[in-house]
């Protein structure tokens, strides 16, 4: 699993980003988690450039807080121009306390509490990603009490099997996350959201799963999501501007 920031000296000493890991272990103890800031920044820039090249200047890749949620990581993401998604008030607090711009934060999760909703609204975050009818109604109430209009995306399930590990497959029709396109539940949720005066529905989000190694999964997802956006326009007269395709690129956990 050696990558271009991991090497061995002629004496057989393992190095990471140019540092002798045995010396780091002596200085900081073990277990010790090492991250290469230069590599992280380079990856951010790669994604940002690819998005600009293929999706235009209005596109934005998001860093998933579940990967590593601590202040320095959020500072790096802020400096590199990334967005972030969070799934708890704790992650939101950490991002904000690191100075991450609230308008580039997306609050995900299918079990948000009233306290989560109130905290996010009070901090002026960019988007809530609403998962179900109950959340929509609760968020409408919270936004009305705060006298604000909150931007949202709706999470829907496209019915895609990414052929990954079952526990991290999230886009199938029977997923616990989001409303299914296939059953009509997603359209019902869209129509409800459009009636709520303190919610500004901007688009849709879906997440097909983690450990996705093939780009064909995203093409199949687009083949469902784009026609669904068209059907929303046909049935409601509203053109939604945002399409957020979620999913985790595969990581080599074994050699």
Cite the ranges covered by each PLM segment:
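Active-site loop/helix belt of alpha/beta enzymes
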Residues: 3, 159-255
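Anionic group-transfer/hydrolysis microenvironments
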Residues: 38, 87, 133, 157-159, ...
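A charged N-terminal "starter" segment
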Residues: 1-151, 187, 191, 196, ...
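Glycine-rich, aromatic-flanked loop segments that form ligand/cofactor-binding clefts
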Residues: 149-161
């Amino acid at each position: 699993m050696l990558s271009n920031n991991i090497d061995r000296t002629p004496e057989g000493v393992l190095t990471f980003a140019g540092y002798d890991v045995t010396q780091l272990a002596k200085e900081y103890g073990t277990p010790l988690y090492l991250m290469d800031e230069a590599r992280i920044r380079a990856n951010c820039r790669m994604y940002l450039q690819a998005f600009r090249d293929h999706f235009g200047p209005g596109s934005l890749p998001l860093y998933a807080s579940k990967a590593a949620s601590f202040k320095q990581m959020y500072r790096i993401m802020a400096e590199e121009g990334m967005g972030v998604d969070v799934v708890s008030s704790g992650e939101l607090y950490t991002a904000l306390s690191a100075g991450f711009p609230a308008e580039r934060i997306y609050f995900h999760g299918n079990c948000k509490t009233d306290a989560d909703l109130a905290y996010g609204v009070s901090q002026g975050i960019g988007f809530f990603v609403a998962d179900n009818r109950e959340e929509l109604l609760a968020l409408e109430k919270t936004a009305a009490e705060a006298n604000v209009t909150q931007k949202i995306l709706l999470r829907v399930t496209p019915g895609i099997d990414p052929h990954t590990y079952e526990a991290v497959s999230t886009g199938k029709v029977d997923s616990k996350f989001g409303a299914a396109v296939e059953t009509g539940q997603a359209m019902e949720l869209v129509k409800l959201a459009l009636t709520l005066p303190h919610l500004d529905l901007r688009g849709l989000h879906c997440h097909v799963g983690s450990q996705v190694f093939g780009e064909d999964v995203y093409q199949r997802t687009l083949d469902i999501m784009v026609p669904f956006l068209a059907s929303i326009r046909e049935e409601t007269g509203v053109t939604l501007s945002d399409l957020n395709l979620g999913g985790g690129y595969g990581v080599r956990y074994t050699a």
